Amino acid sequence: MMLHAQHMPGQPGTSSLVFLHGFSGDCREWQPVGEQFHGCSRLYIDLPGHGGSAAIPVGGFADVIRLLRATLISYNILKFWLVGYSLGGRVAMMAACQGIPGLCGLVVEGGHPGLQNEQARAERRLSDGRWAERFRHEPLTEVFHDWYQQPVFASLTAQQRQALTALRSQNNGETLAAMLEATSLAVQPDLREALNALAFPFYYLCGERDSKFRALAQEVAATCHVIRNAGHNAHRENPAGVVDSLAQILRL
């Protein structure tokens, strides 16, 4: 089994860019940024529970990484950079720490390296469980209205919140809930030590108004790019700034 994806071919002999979206996003999320790198092959993946992969069930990160590897093989992608936002960034970090073959470099935007104690994991398990129940049983417009009131999204304007709520409400609540539980921070290991031992380039992007993830970026051995005029979802709030950072990283 493989994940649904959109593939855009580039020039032969270049490393591919593999884009992983955030929770409740889909393969379209990164395209405004990725299409500025038309010389590279680009693969935009729908993670399990999302978009064209909504019906694909997973029990945890191991299943997600296995599906990611199968998808890369199916497109004959042998050398690649992983570029992931939030949930996609956590999947990318997990894949990197597990030694996914062919990985040339890692770019994470606003991805959490992992909780560091059992109390924090227990609290997160309860919180994600409550959200999952809401996704399963309540209208998605109501759930996402509240979702975007969380402190991490404080930099969004009312108009941006409204647009995101309308966009994300097109999802399937049941499959979102299942993916939220399967990949919760409560079940993700603390990746700091493994990330600090990576043998390939690791870059971290965060919005200048995202104080939580700017602090987390200092806890991993990554080169940090701060995106101006942006909060947690920097590639949506300032795509040109993220394009500039990626161009520097990839030396394009």
From Swiss-Prot:
Species of origin: Salmonella dublin (strain CT_02021853)
Alphabetized SUPFAM superfamilies for the sequence: alpha/beta-Hydrolases
Protein name listed in UniProt: 2-succinyl-6-hydroxy-2,4-cyclohexadiene-1-carboxylate synthase
InterPro entries assigned: AB_hydrolase_1 (IPR000073), AB_hydrolase_fold (IPR029058), SHCHC_synthase_MenH (IPR022485)
Enzyme Commission code: 4.2.99.20
Protein's job: Catalyzes a proton abstraction reaction that results in 2,5-elimination of pyruvate from 2-succinyl-5-enolpyruvyl-6-hydroxy-3-cyclohexene-1-carboxylate (SEPHCHC) and the formation of 2-succinyl-6-hydroxy-2,4-cyclohexadiene-1-carboxylate (SHCHC).
Top EC class for this record: lyase
Subunit structure: Monomer.
